[in-house]
Amino acid sequence: MSAKWEKQEGNIGTLTIEVPAAEVDAAMDQAFKKVVKQINVPGFRKGKMPRKMFEQRFGIESLYQDALEIIVPDSYAKAIDEAGIMPVDYPEIAGTENFVHGQDFSFTAQVTVKPEPKLGDYKGLEVAKLPVEVTDEEVDAQIQEQLARKAELEIKEDEAIVEGDTAVIDFEGFVGDEAFEGGKGEDYPLEIGSGSFIPGFEEQLTGVKAGESKDVVVTFPEEYHAAELAGKEATFKVTVKEVKTKVLPELNDEFAKELDSEVESVEALRAKIKEQTAAQKVAESDAALRDELVEKASENAEFEVPAGMINSETDRMLQEFGQRLQTQGMNLDLYYQFSGQSEEDLRGQMKEEAESRVRVSLTLEAIAEAEKIEATEADIEAELEKMAAQFNMTKEQITGALGGTAVLENDIKIQKTVEFLVENAKITE
């Protein structure tokens, strides 16, 4: 087998692959062995039909498709290695109609390859470090959040619903006079202002009391996942069975100790929260500075991000989002239902971020190559020890879980490249 690579405009090129007749015949033999196992012929055990009889009955061309499914992927994999290219998407294969047994076989693959960024300025970039300040109002807000998490719900007697209350409701939705699937619920605890229902639903329940009913009229979003409801007006017949309000605990020294066993008073709690918030803001400021440097270096580089790489990154982002939803007791299907969005909508929202991620990654790889930045054995060993301590595992177990150290090595190289940008930047306070 031989391969010839011709680079074209952008990140696309054509790989011409020549397969000798001997390899064609070998693929035909494999195809026959596969196909004959599925054929029952009187007088022969299953899979034992002679090749000559098979060809007389079905024709040798009946093996071509199976042979192509063997020879094309195998030859393509060898060809990209021989050509030294790195595809980033599935190839477009052409020329398979030229396949004939006993003859040399030539086909082409149009391939999108990994771009080679033309780097712009990445040293001496000017960035301003964000100031770090923690106000009393921020400390108060955090304490209020902690109090809210400890709040208890108490039933409101003969009082109207206000934002923040939880209404226990029965509801049924109608489009026109017809109820629709999924539009009915009983004893549903709905926190008013949570935004968990269709836009406009929760606001219409403010002012309603327990025991009262109300028709809530909403319009489903145009992009709602259920096509039969998208853009349509619906009426929900809602009965409020119970109204509950949050009652916050009293903030005193005893409760401060309950919130944090390491403090003895409210003042100590406030001081600790202020210190932790300051540390968090310092970390956020440092991260923002790094992000800005990386973004500037990426913007200064010239190259086109292939659509296949954007799609692959969008797939990863969608998978990550689904995993985060699962930790909250949800999944993507439920998210689409409650948000009124489809997978296509969500992918569209992620596309710009996905392209930015790929662009940044390729830029950093190019800078690392230009500056000869590598992850040393000592770097990898130190990171393995750190991870082993963090997850209470051995270094060997960590390596096994990662499937080797290649991913870790690349992560370290990228981190060192970002640090290189920081060390060579012009930073103002």
Swiss-Prot record:
Keywords: Cell cycle, Cell division, Chaperone, Cytoplasm, Isomerase, Rotamase. Its main location: cytoplasm. GO terms for biological process: 'de novo' cotranslational protein folding; cell division; chaperone-mediated protein folding; protein transport; protein unfolding. InterPro entries: PPIase_dom_sf (IPR046357), PPIase_FKBP_dom (IPR001179), Trig_fac (IPR005215), Trigger_fac_C (IPR008880), Trigger_fac_C_sf (IPR037041), Trigger_fac_ribosome-bd_bac (IPR008881), Trigger_fac_ribosome-bd_sf (IPR036611), Trigger_fact/SurA_dom_sf (IPR027304). Gene3D superfamilies: 3.10.50.40, Trigger factor ribosome-binding domain (3.30.70.1050), Trigger factor, C-terminal domain (1.10.3120.10). Residues 164-249 form the PPIase FKBP-type domain. PROSITE patterns: FKBP_PPIASE. GO terms for molecular function: peptidyl-prolyl cis-trans isomerase activity; protein folding chaperone; ribosome binding. It comes from the Bacteria. Its EC number is 5.2.1.8. SUPFAM superfamilies: FKBP-like (SSF54534), Triger factor/SurA peptide-binding domain-like (SSF109998), Trigger factor ribosome-binding domain (SSF102735). It catalyses: [protein]-peptidylproline (omega=180) = [protein]-peptidylproline (omega=0). Pfam families: FKBP_C (PF00254), Trigger_C (PF05698), Trigger_N (PF05697). It is found in: Cytoplasm. GO terms for cellular component: cytoplasm. Coiled coil: none annotated. Belongs to the FKBP-type PPIase family. Tig subfamily. Involved in protein export. Acts as a chaperone by maintaining the newly synthesized protein in an open conformation. Functions as a peptidyl-prolyl cis-trans isomerase. Consists of 3 domains; the N-terminus binds the ribosome, the middle domain has PPIase activity, while the C-terminus has intrinsic chaperone activity on its own. HAMAP family: Trigger_factor_Tig. This is Trigger factor. It comes from Lysinibacillus sphaericus (strain C3-41). The gene is tig.
